Every structure is written in C-alpha cells, then in structure tokens.
Amino acid sequence: MAVANLTTEQAILTEVRKQNRNRRALRLWLGFVLLALFCLVLVGGATRLTNSGLSITEWKPIHGVIPPLSAAEWDEEFRLYQRIPEFQQLNSAMTVDEFKGIFWWEWAHRLIARGIGVIFALPLIFFWLTGRIEKRLRWPLVGILALGGLQGFIGWWMVSSGLSVRTDVSQYRLATHLVMACLIFAGCMWIMRGLSPHSNDPAPARSSRGFAAAIAIFALFQIYLGALVAGLDAGFSYNTWPLMDGAVIPSDLLIQQPFWINAFENPKTVQFIHRIGAYTLFALTLINMVIALRAAPWTTHARRAVVLFSLVTLQAAIGIATLLMQVPLHWGLLHQAGALVVFGFAVANWRGFYGEYPHATAIAERD
C-alpha cells in the first residue's frame, strides 16, 4: 500500500512539474503578445497624432502587406488618397514625398496588427495540438483570437468613416477601436496573470476584489474618454491647468443641443470630462492604497496598491505636461503608453485577488 501511494504521489508530482513548464511557456508567449499589442497601440497613437490614418484608402488584408515598390505604384496610391475629403480640403498642396510620410505610419500599424494575428494564432494551434493548454483556457484563448479578427473589421469600419464626407475618422469609431484593443490586452494579461504563481497573503478587506475591479473598469473608461479627446482634437481646447482658461467649470460646456451631445461631440466638454475622470481615478487608487496599507501592510496586495497609485500619479503628471505643451507627438505617445501601463497593471492587480489557476491535482509539489 505504501509503495502504491508513493508511486501515485510521484506520478502526480511529475504531472505538476510538467504543468508548471507548460505554464511558463504560455506566460512567455502571452508576454510577447502583450509587448506586441503595446507597440501596436503606440503606433496607432502615432498614426492618429500625425493625421496619417486615412492615407491608405483600401482594405487589403493579404495584398496590403506589400507597400508600393515603384514610382508608378506610389503615384497610384497617392491618386487614391487625392479622392478623399481630407486631401481635397486640408492637404491639397501635399506632394508624393510628403504623402509617403503619413503612408508609412498607417502601413506599419496595419502590418503590426497582422503580425500579432500570426504570433497569437500559430502558437495557440501548436500549444493546443501538443496538449500544453489546460482545458479551462482553450476557449478563452480562442475568444481572444476572435476578438482580434473582429478588431480588424472595426479598424476598417473606423477608417471608412473618413473616406466620403468627413476629413477625419469618427471619434466614436476611434474610441471603439481603442477600447477593443484594450479588451484584447486585458484578456491576455488576465490569463497570463492567472498562470503566474501567487502569494497566499490575505486580501486587505472583503471589498478589495470589487474595488480592484472598479479601478480597472474605470481606467478603461478613462481610456475611452481619452480616445474621444484624440478624435476631436480636444487636447487643444484648453491648454491651461489646473483651471480651464481661468475657470474651474468653463461656461461653454453645454452649448450644443441636445445638451447630452456635448459629452461626445463638444471638444471642450470632452476634455473637461476627461480631466474629471483623471481626478476620480487618482482618488480611487489613493483610497485603495490607504485601505491596503492600513489593513494589510507588507503584503503583496499593499505593494501592488502602492505601485498602482504611483503609476496613476505619474500618468496624471504626464497628461498635465502634454496638455500644457499643446500635445507634442512624443508627449502624446508617452501619455497613451502610460494609459495602457496603468490599465494593464490595474487588470493584473484585479486578477491577483483570484489566485493562480488551480493545478490539475490536489497534491502540491514539496521541496
């Protein structure tokens, strides 16, 4: 009986070690995907800030990988751009060489997006076929892949909004595109965090998990507001802080009718709401940190709360600097990068209250 029990335990320990190796491989893969997604969002931000998003007027998922290679091909691409309102109303004096400058941003954004599809799908198939993916994770990962495919359609849906009447893309579609990217990022972060070892530190309070969820969700909402700011060029509306052109609450926030449309289409109102959102997120993370430090000091939960508050504080400082300098490219990109870092850490912090995914066996590996 003792020999049988020992044999069983050794078999279980072998299975646990194998599962740990598989989890390390999956974490490495998802970490690389997260890095690629981070780069994609930054290039997308640069595409928006340089007004390059409408430079490619056709959607060619396969053939579009190859850029123009000859003068004739560049002339043809430029002729397509000359047909849209952005060129006719804003850039009619643009030359082919100047067009190339905006073309490459949009082309790079689309190329990276396609590349992410490959580096997600192919390893997913490999890990699935070789049995390295636990059953509980298979369909969530397939769901993320499906969201990636949907994101491609959303991207073209966004671009198409600026090809016929408008001289830019719809701020609503831009916000949808960015939020979807963040949801894909969050899904990868959630699973990767669940595959990572967790501490056994108790939560600071019963409400800690819910509070962490609220912070992550509000951070995503703040990113949505930031996308509206970018889509409306609202960062140029008020370039003073802490007051908005000398007022705490400007007088022209509700000038459009119906009044609720101001929250989405009035650049000044959108910037005002984004500022209020920043103050709210700062307050939420401050309260979260104070609760954690008082209730469970020296725990991983408290340390995460401190890091999260520090990241939000730094992001707020970057946002203020970007505003005061009237949104220079590098500072605008830094602010967008900071938003994704804050959101990613908020999601990881939220997932940290659930613990590591259970192992397939009930026997833990002993030293």
Curated annotation (Swiss-Prot):
It is found in: Cell membrane. The chain crosses the membrane at residues 25-45, 111-131, 139-159, 174-194, 210-230, 276-296, 305-325, 327-347. It catalyses: Fe(II)-heme o + 2 A + H2O = Fe(II)-heme a + 2 AH2. Its EC number is 1.17.99.9. It is a multi-pass membrane protein. It comes from the Bacteria. Its cofactor is heme b. One of its GO terms (biological process) is heme A biosynthetic process. Pathway: Porphyrin-containing compound metabolism; heme A biosynthesis; heme A from heme O: step 1/1. Keywords: Cell membrane, Heme biosynthesis, Iron, Membrane, Metal-binding, Oxidoreductase, Transmembrane, Transmembrane helix. One of its GO terms (molecular function) is metal ion binding. GO terms for cellular component: plasma membrane. Heme binds at H274, H335. Catalyzes the conversion of heme O to heme A by two successive hydroxylations of the methyl group at C8. The first hydroxylation forms heme I, the second hydroxylation results in an unstable dihydroxymethyl group, which spontaneously dehydrates, resulting in the formyl group of heme A. HAMAP family: HemeA_synth_type2. Interacts with CtaB. PANTHER family: CYTOCHROME C OXIDASE ASSEMBLY PROTEIN COX15, CYTOCHROME C OXIDASE ASSEMBLY PROTEIN COX15 HOMOLOG. Belongs to the COX15/CtaA family. Type 2 subfamily. This is Heme A synthase. It comes from Rhizobium etli (strain CIAT 652). The gene is ctaA.
